[in-house]
Amino acid sequence: MGKHIKLRLIVMNILQWAIWGAYLTSMGNYLVQVGLGPKIGLFYAMQGIVSIFMPALMGIVADKWLGATKTLALCQFIAGAAMLGAGLYAASVESGAIAAGMKVAEMFSFPLFMSLYTISVAFYMPTIALSNSAAYGILEQNGYDTVKDFPPIRVFGTVGFIASMWIMNFCKTSAGTSFQFTYHQFIISGVIGLVLVLYCFTLPKIKKAETQGQSLMDALGLSAFKLFRDKQMAIFFIFSMLLGVALQITNGYATPFISHFQGLPEFAESWGAKNATAIYSISQIAETLGILLIPFAMKKFGIKNVMLIAMLAWVLRFGLFGLGDTGSGVWMLILSCIVYGVAFDFFNISGSLYVNERTSGSVQNSAQGLFMLMTNGIGATVGTLSAQAIVNHFTYSETVMVNGEEMVFTMGDWSTCWYIFAGYALVVAILFFILFKAPAKDAPKLV
């Protein structure tokens, strides 16, 4: 029975993360094709905006009324249906454009597509926490230790994410175009989401626990703002927001950047230029491995140095993209993806652990909510919108013939964009080194 429960949760995690992996890193390539390249930042910023309040709201729904599993199914149904609708709309526009002899970009409605996308991500983002809560509840009811038994199950979520990325990269339309450039990524994401809805109803029921009536202020992390009275905690949260700026930049712009080498004659036939999503998937593999380094790093270096390593890793992440190409410089793109494991994990997970160690009592959950608000909410939103302005300033859209088919790429001075991002991360790292002082091991917890 035990292995059976774990296997069922593994399947749930594979589906949960395959939904996101289908479009998160390749959506930029599609948006460029339909004339929305200059608006890539808006799509990724929307994920940050809805992350500010939707997970908290749906968490309250789960706690007070439906429970984690049913709320997960409800959210996935709305998210999956909206994403499927976005994909089917995009497919209909493409068919209409071909019939009318027009370009897809000339017929594409940004407001309609963006509305469907927004509904989808608004209800998908809460499912990340809800799927974790459902897994915790099922494991605990069956006598498992969540700290020990959940991480190996969660790893399969990353496997699902990577599998979706590879499907988008290597599957092609009848015309030979990779799914990373087409609407198929949204349809596949929506279908997987609806499959997960059905799967949720087969999961074991979780006994409803007595709730402590967490308020919306607590769920959003707003009640934890009193922690700003502690100078070093305030500095930590401010720098969490400043580094959060970097989190979604490469998700939005890495694949359009790598793909643009197809528009340069000297790189047009290189494997890397044609397989941007596959190259980028190395980042997700590195992220999984990076988690394993955290316990050692935290013990060896302490929170300040681990966070500093993460910031310097972001400098390398961006700088290597600025130096690399898909020819002889492809190793720099690969190294950048490997570095991502340290850049992401050493910041996100170590930061969360630090918040947990420094707080106690009723403020602990709110403090975690505040950390998420500062990083994935405010920081990521500001970061993607700022990146959009920078990329739009230094690049332009250009139509190129690839294997007899018109393709649109974002051409221009990409290197300067990456150097600006790297410079920003370096300035943040230097200021963090100067201003943040790690508390003593015996420092009292904040309440």
Feature locations, PLM:
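Cytoplasmic helix-loop-helix junction between adjacent transmembrane helices
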Residues: T118-F156
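C-terminal ends and interior cores of transmembrane alpha-helices
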Residues: F77-M107, L312-T326
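Multi-pass alpha-helical transporter architecture, strongest
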Residues: L57, A86-A91, I192-K205, M407, ...
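Cytoplasmic membrane-interface "Motif A"-like loop-to-helix N-cap segments
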Residues: D63-F77, K299-M311
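Juxtamembrane intracellular "pre-TM" segments in multi-pass secondary transporters
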Residues: M1-K3, P204-F237, G263-A268
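Central cavity-lining transmembrane alpha-helices of secondary-active solute carriers
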Residues: L42-D63, A278-I294
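A membrane-interface helix-boundary motif in multi-pass transporters
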Residues: F170-V191, A389-A425
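Helix-loop boundary and gating motifs at the non-cytosolic
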Residues: M1-I52, Q232-P265, N275-A276, N348
